[in-house]
Amino acid sequence: MWTAVKNDGPPLHYKRKIFEAENPAYAGSYCVDFVTQPFSETDETLPVRTTYFSDAEYEKFGSSDTRPMLVALHGLSGGSYEVYLKHVLAPLVGASGELQWEACVVNSRGCAFHKITSSVLFNARSTWDCRQTVKWLRKMFPNRPLFGIGFSLGANILTNVCLYT
């Protein structure tokens, strides 16, 4: 009820990357939204304050910095736009200096306005998209310590990632 009558939470801005599943057993795509600096462009097909990376932005995306990176997993039918999730991310990414974090949200298949491209959806044992994202993050940001947080079903997925990785 609280999220239905209040505003949409902290005004976080996201850039979206679409990933194609590497494992053919789980064919299809999913998306990851990365918290970014505010921008003015809009995309009516995505949640508010979310756009896709441009080719030029994506070319410059990797980094060798040591800033901590939080990987968040939303609850059932949620996404990066959820108020509860934004209230966790905002103080971390909004801090200054050495206290500032980077963050991304792994949106489960069919969530956060991402088109379903597979007959494989998600459940608590659906670790493949999160594991692929972590592998990709380690390559793009080799010096960043990675941390994870999950909410509801996302917490179950994260627990299984930790158990089976």
Which residues fall in each region the model found?
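Active-site signature of alpha/beta-hydrolase-fold catalytic machinery across serine-
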Residues: 87, 160-164
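Short, surface-exposed "cap/lid" segments of acyl-processing enzymes
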Residues: 35-117, 136-139
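Phosphate/oxyanion-binding active-site loops and adjacent basic polyanion-contact surfaces
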Residues: 24-28, 80-85, 122-129
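Alpha/beta-hydrolase fold nucleophile elbow
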Residues: 140-152
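Residue-level signal for beta-strand positions within conserved beta-sheet cores that form or flank
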Residues: 28, 99, 144
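An N-terminal hydrophobic leader/cap segment in hydrolases
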Residues: 1-63
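Glycine-rich nucleophile elbow surrounding the catalytic serine of serine-hydrolase chemistry
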Residues: 150-161
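Alpha/beta-hydrolase active-site loop
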Residues: 120-141, 160
